[in-house]
Amino acid sequence: MQFSTFQKNLDDWQGSSLIFGVLEEEIASQLENIKFVIDPKLLLKKVTQKKFKGEKGEILSFEFLDQNLETLFIVGLGKLKDLNKSDIENSIGNLVRKTVDKNEKMSILLPWEFINSQLEINQLAESVRLSAYKDNRFNKKKDEKKVLKEIEFLNLKKFENISFEETAQICEGVELARRLVAAPPNSLTPQEMSIQASQIAKDHGLGVKILEAKDCEDLGMGAYLAVAKGSDLDPKFIHLTLKSEGPIKEKIALVGKGLTFDSGGYNLKVGASQIEMMKYDMGGSAAVLGAAKALGAIKPKGLEIHFIVASCENMINGSAVHPGDVVKASNGKTIEINNTDAEGRLTLADALTYASNLKPDSIIDLATLTGAIVVALGNDVAGFWSNNDNLANDLKAASAQSGEELWQMPLQKSYKEGLKSHIADMKNTGPRAGGSITAALFLEEFFDKEIKWAHIDIAGTCWTDKNKGINPSGATGFGVKTLVQWIKNK
């Protein structure tokens, strides 16, 4: 999908489908703004008959047969005093999603004078594109309806030099993450994930290294390989590197959990644990690879960024890890596996150690790690933990800008008691209470304490069962926008 602007006199505009946003006040005067396509008095009569008030999310549609304009959508934006960019994005995005298969091009005219920055316009464009996203890769009969190819913004004179290039690049990263998460586990295997990562590297000039099981064994990655043992599919440890030209002012590592399917192992997932949905247990790696795609195109200055994914399956066979086994991670720590369904943190233990050995200034890991975070925060907000206040504040700022909600959780040190083992350095799970916190405390044991670190648990936010905001039902691509915005803010 492309974005464009029409900055000429509106009387010269031609198009077949127009979205017009109105506030919940003085509707008659606002309708004067579209007199270039229809008589405002006639339209006011029709609007009044429909008892349209311009309330938030209210939609009217009109079809015309005798003029160039075929369809007019009037969208209510609510009261001016309550106007915010999120409501605008959701209102316009929801409408576009409903009509995406009816138009190849849609034009949008809003009260731009109440939108404060070019960033907000870019984010609106981003929301429209992501709302219109469709994934029909696995349908026998491809959708033969129209495909929305272009969004045109009318009368953006306040922002006449606006560019949508980065917006499109970010959207492509989110869309990649969505495709990866939505792909069934017989399609997205560890091997396929490594192919996807290698393609990103090829397209954008990133360095790429794929470690095989023997390479990981040589590095002492006993925790990661213990998880992979139960699968007939070989694990793939993925490392992409984006290095800016010129002096490097900061080195960053982004680490994603990459379980392409999680059966739970011998602690088999049953009932409410939704084993059939465990294809999305690689949501963290999807966010990291989506960010790699976007940032590879954007090419931020002065940074060296490492994208790291320890990909494998957690399955059951005669070689699978047992509950009670003790394994050694690559930093030398021994771990008693008291729950084979807490496997993500085992793979991350070696991935974080690997990242730490690169001596970055900051590490951020993303993972669909715990059901406990879903109980705590639901499906709209991801929890995060950090050992550094500046990093935490920077992530909060990036979250607010990107529209992906984060909530900081405590690294409650007293809870480490629950990870103590009688026979090893630690267990991989603690008590049920505070489960997402003990998971974060576990991860904190696997990198140099001088490194700034944040862990983002996206278990509740990487998937939605129904259309919600800018997300069609299915994979959301959560995390890509926050990571990219955090990098761009540097």
From Swiss-Prot:
The EC designation for this entry is 3.4.11.1, 3.4.11.10
Q: Which cofactor does it need?
A: Mn(2+)
Q: Which UniProt keywords apply?
A: Aminopeptidase, Cytoplasm, Hydrolase, Manganese, Metal-binding, Protease
Q: Please provide the Gene Ontology terms (biological process) for this protein.
A: proteolysis
According to the UniProt record, one GO cellular component term is: cytoplasm
Presence of keyword Coiled coil = no
Q: Which Pfam families match?
A: Peptidase_M17, Peptidase_M17_N
Has keyword Cell inner membrane? Answer: no
Residues reported in the UniProt entry to bind Mn(2+) 2: 257, 262, 281, 343
Residue positions of the active site: 269, 345
Where, per UniProt, does this protein localize? Cytoplasm
The reaction(s) catalysed by this protein are: Release of an N-terminal amino acid, Xaa-|-Yaa-, in which Xaa is preferably Leu, but may be other amino acids including Pro although not Arg or Lys, and Yaa may be Pro. Amino acid amides and methyl esters are also readily hydrolyzed, but rates on arylamides are exceedingly low; Release of an N-terminal amino acid, preferentially leucine, but not glutamic or aspartic acids
User: What does the note under cofactor report?
Assistant: Binds 2 manganese ions per subunit.
Q: Which InterPro entries match?
A: Leucine_aapep/pepB, Macro_dom-like, Peptidase_M17_C, Peptidase_M17_leu_NH2_pept, Peptidase_M17_N
HAMAP family found in the cross-reference section: Cytosol_peptidase_M17
- Which purpose does this protein serve, as stated in its record? Presumably involved in the processing and regular turnover of intracellular proteins. Catalyzes the removal of unsubstituted N-terminal amino acids from various peptides.
What is this protein's name? Probable cytosol aminopeptidase
Species in which this protein is naturally found: Prochlorococcus marinus (strain MIT 9215)
